[in-house]
Amino acid sequence: MANSDEIHYDLVEDDEFDIVNIVVEGLDETSIHSPPPSVSAATHGGVKNPSFSQRRTSGRHDFQKWLHEELGKYPAKTHAQKVVEELDAPKSGLIYLRGFNEPLYPYSDQGPPFRQQRHFFYLSGADFPGCAVTYDIPRQHLIVWIRRNDPRLSLWYGTTPSIEEVKSKSDVSDVRYIDDVTKYLHANLTPDTTLFLLHPDQTPKLEPPSLNLRHRFKGPKIDTTSLLPAIEAARVIKTPHEISLIRRAVALTSLAHRMVLQRIKHLSNEREAHAVFEGFCISQGAPRQSYAVIAASGANASTLHYEANDQPLEGKQTMLLDAGCEWGCYASDVTRTFPLKGKWTKEGEEIYKVVERMQRETIDAIRPGRLYYKLHLVACLVAVEELMKLGILHNGTRTEILAKGTVAAFFPHGLGHHVGLEVHDVSGRERLLLSSSSSSGLSRQAISGSRRLPPPRNMKREQVTPEDLAAMYREAMMDTAGDEVEQSAVAPPPPYRGRQRLKENMVVTVEPGIYFHRPYIQSFFLSNPDHAKYINTKVLDRYWDVGGVRIEDCILVTKDGYENLTTAPKGKEALKIINAGIPGFPCDGKA
């Protein structure tokens, strides 16, 4: 089938399975193994959407067949080779990583669900506890080391994957029992070998003490500083296998968002929206979320990482649903904002259209070579223009207000981040937007009375303060060459240090938002004459009840442009689904 990479589908209602029935264009038995379908997926940059002469209805079975199809072995050896390229390793070297063990809460025999160390998984594909991995650089020999199955433990917890099962799922040179890893290290580490570790604490200890690696090797022979940046740099550009897993995570997440839209008129509390989303993901084989679900109604939507999800929906205008499941340890990240009753208030619709334009214009600008921070500035410029039209911002030109950073009162976070094994994935040797030392920002300094506050919990988006935004603007004004031309290596002044360019096969989010968080705006903008003069409080008073609007999609950077992987309904399509609704409650036997 020509252009089988692009399969488009829409969900249709059926008496039995309303949520997962799919109208598929061009899907037949030969195309079921093609890259994942996408609802109205946007692909731009010289790639034409295919047209198909045949359409047929396909139900739950076909979607699940595609979702669960075998993708081949996890490319662990390819990943190891990518790491070595970034490592610039000597001819004689060996990489050694330990995976995680089962976690326990302090002073308890219980613990959270197991979650594998992501750098370890990248080099092994082993998503279970008690493992290690070694990579002999000159021999290109990758070994995963696993525990033996203990019948006493299997009685309680079941068996862990066998040597044969690990070999069948991961492209590795060998799989062995971890009992023998010490013997292997002793045999393969010579005075000429450099042992690469993530951290000094991971230095293996050999017995007797005279064989301890800390004793045998000194100085540069144990390298605990080079491996971490090398792995993080390698993870930035995704392999085709990784992209396939992210596609599935985003596709399932998009269906779960649609599920919530279909049910929302029948729900009465934020927790029910949370339950519908997460329950659908679990039912389709995705028990883990990439991050804690945010189901924020009304003013709660102005809290960026709202966690309670326990407030009644009665009397609220909108819901902001930020949720994404994992698939095969790879994350998704999608946000939709919608009116709970299927019809916007005047103020809510106005703000939604602002954010809609912010996202549309930034996504349309994505292509390889683009400086990501300039996309953030595009979103900010659109926000300034639109908020001036509404009268919320005034008393200055758009350039003046942007240069002051005042729009950060309403758009206080970064445009997006990488997505991969983590929802806020590593960015390599360059920051996508901000340096880690600057991500905590402005007014945190004022809040705490000290230079910085500790990093917040569950932080998956970076704060952008007026100072940060002003620094980005100054940098852009000095950056006279085109986006695709490499600039001087001289770092811009603090706090802004992010100069990462988009490259093919990066996956990033684009998640602009406008928020009306009263304590933040009043404390750090309306009380500051430098910003207060640009904010019309009489007009602003009409918008507090909107809370916040955010729209977030996962974007794959392609050779000539981008592909929007996210197919969750938004805009008019979302309103249509809300108002069509479904009869009954989600547990009535449907979906």
UniProtKB/Swiss-Prot annotation:
Residue sites binding Mn(2+) 2 per the record: 322, 333, 552
Cofactors named for this entry: Mn(2+)
Top EC category: hydrolase
UniProt: Mn(2+) 1 binding residues: 333, 511, 552
Assigned EC number: 3.4.11.9
Cofactor binding, note field: Binds 2 manganese ions per subunit.
Residue stretches of biased makeup (Low complexity): 441-450
GO BP terms, alphabetized: proteolysis
Keyword hit for Protease: yes
Entry-linked SMART domains: AMP_N
Pfam families cross-referenced by the UniProt entry: AMP_N (PF05195), Peptidase_M24 (PF00557)
CDD domains referenced in this protein's UniProt entry, alphabetically: Prolidase
Keyword annotations from UniProtKB, A to Z: Aminopeptidase, Hydrolase, Manganese, Metal-binding, Metalloprotease, Protease
Origin: domain of life: Eukaryota
Molecular function terms from GO: manganese ion binding; metalloaminopeptidase activity
Range of residues in the leader sequence: none
Disordered: annotated span: 31-59, 441-460
Family: Belongs to the peptidase M24B family.
Stored PANTHER family: XAA-PRO AMINOPEPTIDASE 3, XAA-PRO AMINOPEPTIDASE AN0832-RELATED
Function: Catalyzes the removal of a penultimate prolyl residue from the N-termini of peptides.
Protein name: Probable Xaa-Pro aminopeptidase PEPP
Natural source organism: Sordaria macrospora (strain ATCC MYA-333 / DSM 997 / K(L3346) / K-hell)
Lineage of the species this protein comes from: Eukaryota, Fungi, Dikarya, Ascomycota, Pezizomycotina
